[in-house]
Amino acid sequence: MTNSSDDFTQSAEPFKLFAEWLADAAKSEPNDPNAVALATVDPDGLPNVRMVLLKDFDETGFVFYTNYESKKGQEILSAEKAAMCFHWKSLRRQVRVRGPVEKVSDAEADAYYASRPRGSRIGAWASKQSRPLESRFALEKAVAEYTAKYAIGDIPRPPYWSGFRIRPVSIEFWHDRPFRLHDRVLFTRPTPEGDWNKDRLYP
């Protein structure tokens, strides 16, 4: 792990820097170093935020999976933009990501869905995510029904369950420093295909 926060301010490659910070978090954070706060906005402009798990990232963007019929799924499909904030308290680091959102390919979604535990794949069918639930029993009944339905063979991916990729136009790295004189580096580009510009920010 890098001990000097000054080291990161020299970086010119945001995805490489993110990979290094995520690797540090995997060694330091006790639970879910890939947990991230995902912010969306509803049709009235009212923000929503919730924790999700980052499942993949590369130079094209940051990937997570969800039910497209959920509140966050519907808000993303409508606005086609989102933001993320990673906070690794043990490292006193934060990364903020903003950009347009695209659906992952069916092949990507199928591959990730197939890698999930069987119970999680059943749950994707049983849960009408974000909609009112009359009782815990109703959910458990749905789980039992789909468990019986898919007792033999593979469990197909629900048509409404897939992934999104945030294609960043802004990535900011923050490191805590004494007396709130933090280090901040912001990478921006006009489009997801553009070249990165880098600025150091006042804390």
UniProtKB/Swiss-Prot annotation:
<dbReference type="InterPro" id="IPR019740">
    <property type="entry name" value="Pyridox_Oxase_CS"/>
</dbReference>
<feature type="binding site">
    <location>
        <begin position="65"/>
        <end position="66"/>
    </location>
    <ligand>
        <name>FMN</name>
    </ligand>
</feature>
<dbReference type="Pfam" id="PF01243">
    <property type="entry name" value="PNPOx_N"/>
</dbReference>
<feature type="binding site">
    <location>
        <position position="112"/>
    </location>
    <ligand>
        <name>substrate</name>
    </ligand>
</feature>
<comment type="pathway">
    <text>Cofactor metabolism; pyridoxal 5'-phosphate salvage; pyridoxal 5'-phosphate from pyridoxine 5'-phosphate: step 1/1.</text>
</comment>
<comment type="pathway">
    <text>Cofactor metabolism; pyridoxal 5'-phosphate salvage; pyridoxal 5'-phosphate from pyridoxamine 5'-phosphate: step 1/1.</text>
</comment>
<dbReference type="InterPro" id="IPR011576">
    <property type="entry name" value="Pyridox_Oxase_N"/>
</dbReference>
<comment type="subunit">
    <text>Homodimer.</text>
</comment>
<dbReference type="Pfam" id="PF10590">
    <property type="entry name" value="PNP_phzG_C"/>
</dbReference>
<keyword id="KW-0664">Pyridoxine biosynthesis</keyword>
<dbReference type="InterPro" id="IPR012349">
    <property type="entry name" value="Split_barrel_FMN-bd"/>
</dbReference>
<feature type="binding site">
    <location>
        <position position="184"/>
    </location>
    <ligand>
        <name>FMN</name>
    </ligand>
</feature>
<protein>
    <recommendedName>
        <fullName>Pyridoxine/pyridoxamine 5'-phosphate oxidase</fullName>
        <ecNumber>1.4.3.5</ecNumber>
    </recommendedName>
</protein>
<feature type="binding site">
    <location>
        <begin position="129"/>
        <end position="130"/>
    </location>
    <ligand>
        <name>FMN</name>
    </ligand>
</feature>
<comment type="similarity">
    <text>Belongs to the pyridoxamine 5'-phosphate oxidase family.</text>
</comment>
<dbReference type="GO" id="GO:0008615">
    <property type="term" value="P:pyridoxine biosynthetic process"/>
</dbReference>
<feature type="binding site">
    <location>
        <position position="174"/>
    </location>
    <ligand>
        <name>FMN</name>
    </ligand>
</feature>
<dbReference type="GO" id="GO:0010181">
    <property type="term" value="F:FMN binding"/>
</dbReference>
<keyword id="KW-0288">FMN</keyword>
<feature type="binding site">
    <location>
        <begin position="180"/>
        <end position="182"/>
    </location>
    <ligand>
        <name>substrate</name>
    </ligand>
</feature>
<feature type="binding site">
    <location>
        <begin position="50"/>
        <end position="55"/>
    </location>
    <ligand>
        <name>FMN</name>
    </ligand>
</feature>
<dbReference type="GO" id="GO:0004733">
    <property type="term" value="F:pyridoxamine phosphate oxidase activity"/>
</dbReference>
<feature type="binding site">
    <location>
        <position position="94"/>
    </location>
    <ligand>
        <name>FMN</name>
    </ligand>
</feature>
<comment type="function">
    <text>Catalyzes the oxidation of either pyridoxine 5'-phosphate (PNP) or pyridoxamine 5'-phosphate (PMP) into pyridoxal 5'-phosphate (PLP).</text>
</comment>
<keyword id="KW-0560">Oxidoreductase</keyword>
<feature type="binding site">
    <location>
        <position position="116"/>
    </location>
    <ligand>
        <name>substrate</name>
    </ligand>
</feature>
<feature type="binding site">
    <location>
        <position position="120"/>
    </location>
    <ligand>
        <name>substrate</name>
    </ligand>
</feature>
<feature type="binding site">
    <location>
        <position position="72"/>
    </location>
    <ligand>
        <name>FMN</name>
    </ligand>
</feature>
<dbReference type="InterPro" id="IPR019576">
    <property type="entry name" value="Pyridoxamine_oxidase_dimer_C"/>
</dbReference>
<keyword id="KW-0285">Flavoprotein</keyword>
<feature type="binding site">
    <location>
        <position position="71"/>
    </location>
    <ligand>
        <name>FMN</name>
    </ligand>
</feature>
<dbReference type="InterPro" id="IPR000659">
    <property type="entry name" value="Pyridox_Oxase"/>
</dbReference>
<feature type="binding site">
    <location>
        <position position="55"/>
    </location>
    <ligand>
        <name>substrate</name>
    </ligand>
</feature>
